[in-house]
């Protein structure tokens, strides 16, 4: 039975998603600011967990954090033609300040390649200054016409890395390092979301990039979500902003740059990959609260005994598990069970007077709602048992998501088969079409090339649209 207030996925997937966001208390609509949301404490705690996991990996690969201005001179955006064309419709401008018209308008940061490129041109002088590896955590504004909480909002939070290198090979190595060792590693291991690592098509690549790499995930409605991108910018931005260095032979060279980013849409990916009709489901490694304890008692005397047992039990957990004891006296145990299930806490521990007598507790797994996920276990050795169960849940969520993707991905050999397959999931096919061909397919099916998988077949096949022989396969899907 679906939770009250949550539309079943099978009935209306889009409304189900919005219901989860609101019922799990993740966000509120900022009606007074078009397309923006308020991150409520529960939603922001998820973003903090995402930040920690990514920030550790970003720093482990040799990068450092910095912060650059929110306002960017409009002239900076105009310096890279392909870049400005790609972002112009989404840009918000500041034209007045201090009661006066500005001599030059500012744009509110849609992304930071241009202003960071300006500063890099001042900081980089010699090959000894390279590589320059900087990341920033920031907010971004893009004037979206159709918004949806976390997935597409006018203002969103993200990290964006910007690096400078002496050679194209170094820049390419950096781009793939971020894709594999930071983004894919985090999303698969911490978020339990399987991803396809690939290259963007010319139509879908980042404006101004030489090559764009991505990780693509499948949501429970079969649609794709781009979970992260890593761009080799070539020398385009280096030439636009004069980022040069003197090499070992005392010759001035243009540098090679990269940029890469993920955003709060990862929260949307988490919701749509793992959650169910009972509410939010959070993978244990990412969960702000991994275990919630619900003490059960009927009077003050029982309360005293139970709470003493809870304190002894949880004393062992400190530093090992992220836990919360729900000792609110004004709510029934049933209400608490429902609330924590709705909020996606991976494990619920129930303990009452009878459990204390038996030396046991009841454990309920969030990934298995109802009787299937409930069991009684001894209090002795509980800490180790909970830690093992959290890891078991983490792996189970990943396997379930991977199995779903595999059963909703199919190889297609004709355009008609592609049209049918994108109704239910990913269509994998041989492709030798043009950008115009891809645009026509999007107009007819609402599907795009999500990526050209890095894992390509050895044998050749025929393009589903042109009939030409090719060894390149792509993934077509509808996307968020």
Swiss-Prot record:
Per its UniProt record, what SUPFAM superfamilies does this chain match?
C-terminal domain of ProRS, Class II aaRS ABD-related, Class II aaRS and biotin synthetases
Question: At the top level of its lineage, which domain of life is listed?
Answer: Bacteria
Q: Name one GO biological process term.
A: prolyl-tRNA aminoacylation
Q: What is its main location?
A: cytoplasm
Subcellular location(s) of the protein:
Cytoplasm
Residues folding into a coiled coil are none
Instruction: Report the enzyme's class at the first EC level.
Output: ligase
SMART domains, alphabetized: ProRS-C_1 (SM00946)
Might you report a single GO cellular component term? aminoacyl-tRNA synthetase multienzyme complex
Alphabetized Pfam families for the sequence: HGTP_anticodon, ProRS-C_1, tRNA-synt_2b
- Any idea which GO molecular function terms this record carries? ATP binding; proline-tRNA ligase activity
Q: Which PANTHER family does the record associate with it?
A: BIFUNCTIONAL GLUTAMATE_PROLINE--TRNA LIGASE, PROLYL-TRNA SYNTHETASE
Q: How does it assemble?
A: Homodimer.
The record's comment about this protein's domains reads: Consists of three domains: the N-terminal catalytic domain, the anticodon-binding domain and the C-terminal extension.
Q: What does this protein do?
A: Catalyzes the attachment of proline to tRNA(Pro) in a two-step reaction: proline is first activated by ATP to form Pro-AMP and then transferred to the acceptor end of tRNA(Pro).
**What name does this protein carry?**
Proline--tRNA ligase
């Amino acid at each position: 039975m679906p939770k009250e207030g949550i539309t079943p996925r099978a009935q209306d997937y889009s409304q189900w998603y919005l219901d989860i966001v609101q019922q799990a208390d993740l966000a509120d609509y900022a009606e007074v600011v078009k397309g923006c949301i308020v991150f409520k404490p529960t939603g922001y705690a998820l973003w903090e967990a995402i930040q920690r996991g990514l920030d550790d990996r970003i720093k482990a690969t040799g990068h450092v954090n910095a912060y650059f201005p929110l306002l960017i001179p409009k002239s900076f955006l105009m310096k890279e033609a392909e870049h400005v064309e790609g972002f112009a419709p989404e840009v918000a401008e500041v034209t007045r300040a201090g009661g006066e018209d500005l001599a030059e308008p500012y744009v509110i940061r849609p992304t930071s390649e241009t202003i960071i490129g300006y500063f890099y041109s001042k900081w980089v002088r010699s090959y000894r200054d390279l590589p320059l590896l900087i990341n920033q955590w920031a907010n971004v504004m893009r004037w979206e016409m159709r918004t949806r909480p976390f997935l597409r909002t006018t203002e969103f939070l993200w990290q964006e890395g910007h690096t400078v290198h002496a050679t194209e090979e170094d820049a390419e190595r950096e781009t793939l390092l971020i894709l594999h060792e930071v983004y894919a590693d985090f999303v698969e291991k911490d978020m339990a979301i399987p991803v396809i690592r690939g290259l963007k098509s010319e139509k879908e690549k980042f404006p101004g990039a030489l090559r764009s790499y991505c990780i693509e995930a499948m949501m429970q409605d079969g649609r794709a979500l781009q979970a992260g991108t890593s761009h080799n910018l070539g020398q385009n931005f280096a030439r636009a902003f004069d980022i040069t260095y003197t090499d070992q032979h005392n010759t001035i060279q243009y540098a090679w740059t990269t940029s890469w980013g993920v955003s709060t849409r990862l929260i949307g990916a988490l919701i749509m990959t793992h959650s169910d009709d009972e509410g939010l489901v959070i993978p244990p490694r990412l969960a702000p609260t991994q275990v919630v304890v619900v003490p059960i008692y009927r009077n003050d005397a029982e309360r005293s005994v139970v709470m003493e047992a809870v304190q002894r039990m949880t004393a062992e957990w400190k530093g090992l598990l992220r836990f919360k004891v729900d000792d609110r006296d004004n709510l029934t145990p049933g209400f608490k069970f429902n609330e924590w299930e709705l909020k996606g806490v991976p494990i619920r521990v129930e303990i009452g007077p009878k459990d204390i007598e038996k030396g046991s507790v009841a454990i309920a797994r969030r990934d298995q709602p109802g009787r299937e996920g409930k069991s009684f276990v001894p209090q002795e050795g509980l800490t180790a048992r909970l830690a093992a169960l959290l890891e078991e849940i983490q792996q189970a969520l990943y396997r379930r998501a991977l199995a779903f993707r595999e059963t909703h991905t199919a190889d297609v050999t004709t355009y008609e088969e592609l049209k049918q397959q994108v109704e239910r999931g990913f269509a994998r096919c041989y492709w030798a079409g043009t950008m115009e061909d891809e645009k026509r397919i999007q107009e007819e099916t609402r599907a795009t090339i999500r990526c050209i998988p890095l894992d390509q077949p050895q044998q050749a096949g025929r393009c589903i649209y042109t009939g030409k022989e090719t060894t390149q396969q792509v993934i077509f899907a509808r996307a968020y």
